[in-house]
Amino acid sequence: MGKPKKANVATIKNVNLEKQITEGRVAKNKNKDKVKLRAEESANIDARSSQKILAAAKLQQLELDEENFPSLVTVKKVNFSLNDGHVKEDEEVNETDLMADLDMDEDDVAAFERFQQPAQEGKRTLHLSKMIMQKIQEKEADIHTKISDEGSLKIEEIDPKVKEMYEGVRDVLKRYRSGKIPKAFKIIPKLRNWEQILFITEPHNWSAAAMFQGTRIFCSVLSQAMAQRFYNLVLLPRVRDDLCEYKKLNMHLYNALKRALFKPAAFMKGIILPLLEGGDCTLREAIIFGSVVARSSIPVLHSSACLLKICEMAYSGANSIFIRYFLDKRYALPYRVVDAAVFHFLRFENDKRELPVLWHQSLLTFAQRYKNDISSEQRDALLQLLKKKSHFKITPDVRRELQAASCRDVEMMETDNGLAGQPAKMYTDADVEYEG
């Protein structure tokens, strides 16, 4: 092996600073980063950076306009999304902005109220507390019954310590605004008697933020049938009470409705259909609940089934709002649903009452979206209907749409005639692998 090399360490001599400078033995200045001149920079900017620059410039311009010309600044519209979980408590949803699309005046609102049916006692939505008390009374009347029917409420004896714990959860949920939810509350959907435990927490006294968190937890854990019960017994009464008391809806409750759409079948059966079947749905409720449907993506089958039920039930002004919102989604509806919508409009041919503008708007939406999915007989019947039920602004547009329709039976006949002249292909046994 060779000898190890010595480290090349420069010896430092005791010389004064003047000699070090003159001899050039001081450390040289390192090359600093050169600043590029603006002319030397690349002229090409990628699309993403340019979008950020334009957005920042637009935001700055809006801020300057707000400071200098506040009267010229337009009010911004709020875009709702499922991720809007952290919202201030005082933010609310008002139906005034949503009514702009419906183009209604005071006379139209009066016509809407004429078609509002009186609430039937058997159709009213029951609160969870009332239903729990009914079940307790039934159990006391029938001591020998140990197990309730499947799908009904499970009433069991509750340990005093468990009851005391959930009373503490109740106090937390009353004043909850943000933060973590108690773990004892999160396990309620997994319990067999979850309705009875939920009754201890008093859902009607929850804060709006607690209702949103509860809806998020229950819709993710419960099945479709159990989620439907939660929507019907807890969420729907709370939203309607909030609208009735404050004339507007808290943003947390609105987000809870949007979160409930994660279970679309439960949402339709537990909220929309009970709301309309009662016949006492107000215009404010119809607009706000309908906006959730209009702004969310719903599977076609669930939308079709709900639209079919709405077309077949007794009419109220709120039905037309939901029919219009569902038709505006432009889904490929089955012919059975299209036929039900046609019969829904035709049954008013001999009705002597003046129909609200909402009915005419829903008919126009149907003609615009599904004019090519109706038969020739249905088109003629609708044109005949327009002679008896007309609106000076909307009916001409409906008639024009129907007259320009390509009916489905005509298209089927043309398709069959086009295929009639073509020679039919003869398949052999080899083609279907039948030989051997």
Swiss-Prot record:
Keywords: Nucleus, Phosphoprotein, Ribosome biogenesis. It comes from the Eukaryota. It is found in: Nucleus, Nucleolus. GO terms for molecular function: snoRNA binding. Coiled coil: none annotated. The keyword Phosphoprotein applies. One of its GO terms (cellular component) is nucleus. GO terms for biological process: rRNA processing. The modification Phosphothreonine is found at residue 145. The modification Phosphoserine is found at residues 148, 152. Required for processing of 20S pre-rRNA precursor and biogenesis of 40S ribosomal subunits. Belongs to the bystin family. PANTHER family: BYSTIN. This is Bystin. The gene is bys.
